[in-house]
Amino acid sequence: MNVNVVGHFSCRLCGSDLETSVDLGEHPIVNRLSEKPRQVKKYPMQVGGCKQCGLFQILEPIDALEFYTNYDNGSSVKREPHLHKLLDQLSSILSANAKIIDIGCNDGKFLSHLRETGFTNLIGLEPTKNMSSVAVASGFKVFNTFLDVSTANEIVLSEGKFDCVVIRQVLEHISNLESFGLAIQQLVKPGGMIAIEVPDAQLNFRGPDYALWEEHVNYFTIKSLEFFLRLNGIKLVSSYVSIFSGICLTVLGQKILQESEALDFEPFDNATTDDFLSFKKWSTEFLTFKENVRKEIKSFKEKGVEVVLYGVGSRSSPFLNIMGVNDTLSFAIDDDPRKQGKFLPGSNIEIVSREDGVSRLNGQSLILLGVNEENEEKLIGELSSRSSLIFKSILPPSERLLSAFN
């Protein structure tokens, strides 16, 4: 791992030269599970921090076509108890016939929530063929395309401009923020609303959380997200954080009514500098943290305790890869039948069902919890009859984290 000056990368948010980076090694695409053990392609993961706007970012993103042409990340299987707050906000400021587009609508789950809330004029955009088909089957009109200025213009010609643009768990995936921002400007009416939800990068700094998913190429705090809004003529109305897949940050913005309406702000202030300093600290502490994680897990192994992962996902799998602890695991358990019987890419760790996994456990076992915090207590309660199980989480902000996080 090297922390160094970046010679040839510019920030994809503000365009400034990036000054500091950390090399986390080469890793596979974590959601590309294998039908049988095999060697897979690995990609470099170098992360840079911007001293000017505070955004930290993966420097060389994998081409989006590698992920999203045909992609199975159905949102309907995920519990999202935090959504009621956003739905309440939108219903309090928008009429039932307000024209709303959900960018990256996936299988249409949030569109369905909007429909259940009483909204009637709903459209989605989803680049993956299989997920967009599911949303269409649920009764929604969906544009099966990536969003850029050209497609935004086509959508506006077809549908007109929108009263509200929803962008949930999408902006962190976007490698061309300038083009995406211009497209959003095209879609929303003057005075219209923009709702954005992203993972909160403050969790990475505080956790610390080094489980970087290769699909998440941008890591926003409230300051860098507000910077994105203002660059695109959108003023921040409200923001809040929720427990979901770590911690997520939700903001509601409003497009300025006319170009002459000023958005005075100092783009590079103390808060963005603080974000950069947090990134530098996070970077320089990585090696020590990794060593402590490896020592802690191996200490269980050396005592004859079997080590098993529970929950194969886009946070847990990168954690194992980046920490270099795959060699300590016997197998992984996951409740999703689509994953069972397959193998983790790169490590070739077998994924089994709960019934199969529990039957394999003999004596004391360390269960590394790779499920989100909101699901931990339910899972532990269901396994409480096995007193020989030791539960330790690998995903902040859990209260059951490995000691290395302290």
Can you name each region flagged by the protein language model?
Residues 89-90, 113, 252, 257-406:
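Hydrophobic, well-ordered beta-alpha structural blocks that scaffold small-molecule cofactor pockets
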Residues 38, 140-144, 212-215, 256, ...:
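Short, hinge-like loop/turn segments at secondary-structure boundaries
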Residues 88-210, 219-232, 253, 317-319, ...:
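Conserved SAM-binding loop
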Residues 202-276:
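Contiguous mid-protein beta-loop-alpha structural module that forms a pocket-lining wall or clamp
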Residues 41-134, 139, 143-145, 208, ...:
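Extended interfacial segments that mediate partner engagement and assembly in macromolecular machines
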Residues 2-79, 240, 250-252:
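N-terminal juxtadomain amphipathic helix
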Residues 19, 143, 237-240, 352, ...:
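General small-molecule cofactor/ligand-binding pocket signal
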Residues 25-26, 33, 205-209, 251, ...:
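Short aromatic-enriched loop/helix-cap "lid" or pocket-rim segments at secondary-structure transitions
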